[in-house]
Amino acid sequence: MNMTGGGAGPQAGPNSSCNIPNSSLLATAPVAATMPIAQLADGWLELESDPGLFTLLLEDFGCHDVQVEEVYDLQKPIESPYGFIFLFRWIEERRARRKIVETTAEIFVKDEEAISSIFFAQQVVPNSCATHALLSVLLNCNENNLQLGDTLSRLKAHTKGMSPENKGLAIGNTPELACAHNSHAMPQARRRLERTGAGVSSCRFTGEAFHFVSFVPINGQLFELDGLKPYPMNHGGWEDHEDWTDKFRRVMTERLGIATGEQDIRFNLMAVVPDRRIAITHKLKMLRTNQAIVSGTLQKLLKADEQGEGGNGDPQRPDTPSTLLEPSAFTARDLQSLLKNLDTEIAINEQHLADENDRRHKFKVDASRRTHNYDKFICTFLSMLAHQGVLGELVSQHLLPSKKISGQSAANRLNKQSNATANAGATAAGAAGAAPKSQQQQAAAAKNGKSPSKTPGRRRKGRNKCKKRK
């Protein structure tokens, strides 16, 4: 499901960065030389809600061990997620939003010390909610489990202790983030920004927008981080026998029940998870190590059996790194069966790794198609067709046949109606002409004293019969 997530926020003016310490702007980055700091906050573009786009965006941020997956079933278990990103339709005046605001106002965390201890940034830059949602998940994770990269590590260190508003300005004025964000936008997003004016989100003021929020576990509590809210929201902890994802499922189920009260099902849920290729590669390494151990043990066992059959005394026990693979523990048949299972597992995981690499390649192909501007090609192609004089013929062949067919059918219907009318008129006219003729015959017969009921034809037949009798 691909939807554009603009998510408008208050417009940051050209001098908005003066409220932030200079060290937090990361102006020393090489990209800053080509992009003025004052214009960064005014040029963020809308992004689609696509897991491939978000995965490549994380790579551009410098975080290479993470990927984003779309969640289709809340009840399906997800392995080791860092957090969730929820995209929903944003309409401020709708009834469901008032219900959500009433329920979330009670769980706002207003303690300044608690707010400063986590990474919560208000969205002060329009159209930056996609990057905000990703950073809200990544910068609240344990650094021991996740390698953020230079850009995000520097941003996290420089914004430590800042207010949520200044953190939002720091995000908007970071050149690496702005360039990476805009590099994945469609050309239509740039044209919309130019039409509506810099720094203003077009869909916010038309009442139609999609907004991203993040759900992440922090210190045993489930937090909802929404850059358009004044405070972070604490949904509470979870039971000792539960995982934090169980708590998230309950919260999200309730949220979807409120949000879809008006039959609006346009939402999207994505999970930020570790790169699947890392786990598959680690598993393949372990399987290949076990394969080598089992294969070596099997070869030594077979060799020992051959020596025993040759009458050289007791076979020597093979030297193995594990006592579990001693000949006394496994027979040759057991080792062959185990080796076959390992070969199957290795083939399956190699296929999984190839599938993940193909997915990552497909992400890049889709990104190239998404961000490429086809306007020049289409205009040039149509101009060449018009110059060769074939454009009009192609248009008439592909666009006009339906109109011709409908016009011909209408004409046929009119012709049938006119023919039916003409036939009916002719029949009526014939009937009208025959009536006076019969009336004249009856009048002449009455004048001659003959019965009008007897026809002349019948009288002739009677006379002919009389002549024959004579």
Swiss-Prot record:
The record marks 226 as: Important for enzyme activity. Transmembrane segments: none annotated. InterPro entries: Papain-like_cys_pep_sf, Peptidase_C12_UCH, Peptidase_C12_UCH_sf, UCH_C. Residues 43-274 form the UCH catalytic domain. Residues 373-401 form the ULD domain. Its EC number is 3.4.19.12. Its main location: nucleus. Residues 403-470 are annotated as: Positively charged C-terminal tail required for binding nucleosomes. The record marks 123 as: Transition state stabilizer. This is Ubiquitin carboxyl-terminal hydrolase calypso. The lineage of its organism: Eukaryota, Metazoa, Ecdysozoa, Arthropoda, Hexapoda.
